């Protein structure tokens, strides 16, 4: 089986198919960088890790799209927010667009599976002063406020303060491997089952 892309979709597909005994080859056009190569220099990382050097737009220029052009795709360059598709969107897809599988229990089990493997949690969360003020202000105004779950895992031996500082740089690649994107999770699983990656 040839899988094109190594991000959120490709990584999961590769791991599941390899575990099922399929011979899997993952084709990725983007670069691979080791953790130590994520230097947190904004322009260099954007130029290296993002499709179109971060300037990818729709044909009419009305929408800017930030897409990963690296091993792990968007899971390498996202900000680690990991929330489920809202129920109202799933209902719309099922009822108005003829895709009933979005409401099937197996689909929800898929969310559970991915969240477990990606260590999705709100426990490793600390608001900076700006976000804390926004959170508190919204609560005082009567808005419902919730923390956004993130796919993060504290690394043993990593200074907790360094962990928190590094989170601000996670869209530029995670130098410590705390963000549990495709490279840290599903691609490792796929490789352990014999899958291969072709750059």
Question: Which residues fall in each region the model found?
Answer:
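Conserved redox-cofactor binding core of oxidoreductases
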Residues: 100-199
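N-terminal glycine-rich phosphate/pyrophosphate-binding loop and immediately adjacent elements
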Residues: 1-96, 100-105
């Amino acid at each position: 089986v040839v899988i094109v892309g190594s991000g959120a979709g490709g990584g999961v597909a590769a791991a599941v198919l390899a575990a099922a005994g399929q011979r899997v080859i993952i084709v990725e056009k983007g670069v691979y960088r080791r953790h130590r190569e994520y230097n947190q220099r904004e322009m260099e990382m954007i130029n290296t890790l993002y499709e179109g050097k971060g300037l990818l737009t729709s044909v009419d220029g009305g929408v800017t799209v930030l897409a990963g052009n690296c091993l792990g795709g968007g899971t390498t360059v996202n900000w680690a927010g990991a929330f489920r598709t809202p129920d109202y969107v799933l209902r719309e897809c099922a009822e108005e667009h003829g895709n009933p599988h979005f409401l099937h229990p197996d689909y929800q089990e898929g969310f559970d599976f991915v969240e477990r493997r990606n260590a999705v949690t709100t426990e490793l969360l600390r608001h900076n002063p700006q976000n804390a003020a926004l959170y508190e202000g919204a609560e005082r105004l009567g808005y419902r406020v919730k923390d956004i779950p993130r796919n993060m895992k504290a690394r043993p031996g990593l200074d907790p303060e360094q962990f928190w500082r590094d989170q601000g740089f996670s869209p530029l690649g995670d130098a410590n491997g705390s963000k549990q994107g495709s490279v840290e999770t599903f691609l490792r699983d796929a490789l352990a089952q014999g899958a291969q990656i072709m750059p």
